[in-house]
Design a protein with these regions (language model features):
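Acidic, glycine-enriched catalytic cores built around paired aspartates
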Residues: 1-168
Length: 168
């Protein structure tokens, strides 16, 4: 619904003049006037936050067993208030994305591959399949405002990692 409303309410007259088919059809690109159609694109935000969260759960809940899933869930629900020791342990003792750690790199590959195949398996209301990407330039800040605490120790409301970069 959001995608359809976006195309109906926000035409791109200038961009449309640059694309094949809009003159001939007399339609804006958002009205289907272009000769070649791709997308729309779903741009992923927070991929390294996802990877680090999964790595934290795998490492601390399943491998080292130094945190129970119940305790982690409670800490997340409370934004780590009263769980600062756990938060510090998660942040400082979890293998993180971007550090050339094979098991984390494999996890990143598996998750991005899964997301890619899931996204392209769906068609938009305009017909073409969705395309995916991991290159948001600035959405990590506003998206972070609405994301709760994460298992690697990130507190609620703070910025997510930029694009597909590791946290810094």
């Amino acid at each position: 619904i959001n995608e359809k409303l976006y195309f109906e309410l926000t035409p791109f007259p200038f961009v449309s003049t640059l694309l094949d088919g809009t003159y001939e059809s007399g339609k804006d690109l958002t009205a289907g006037g272009v000769k070649y159609t791709i997308g729309p694109a779903l741009i992923g935000t927070g991929i390294s936050d996802l990877i680090d969260s999964l790595a934290a759960i795998k490492t601390h809940v399943f491998d080292e067993k130094n945190v129970t899933m119940e305790a982690l869930i409670k800490a997340l629900e409370n934004d780590f208030e009263g769980y600062e020791d756990m938060r510090q342990m998660l942040m400082n003792n979890t293998p993180m994305y971007g550090n050339d750690i094979p098991e984390v790199d494999i996890l990143a590959e598996e998750m991005t591959d899964f997301a890619y195949h899931e996204i392209i398996s769906h068609k938009s209301w305009r017909g073409p399949h969705y395309i995916s990407g991991l290159y948001p330039v600035s959405s990590h800040v506003p998206h972070g405002l609405v994301v709760g605490a994460l298992p690697y120790g990130r507190k609620a409301g703070t910025a997510l990692a930029d694009g597909c970069s590791p946290k810094g």
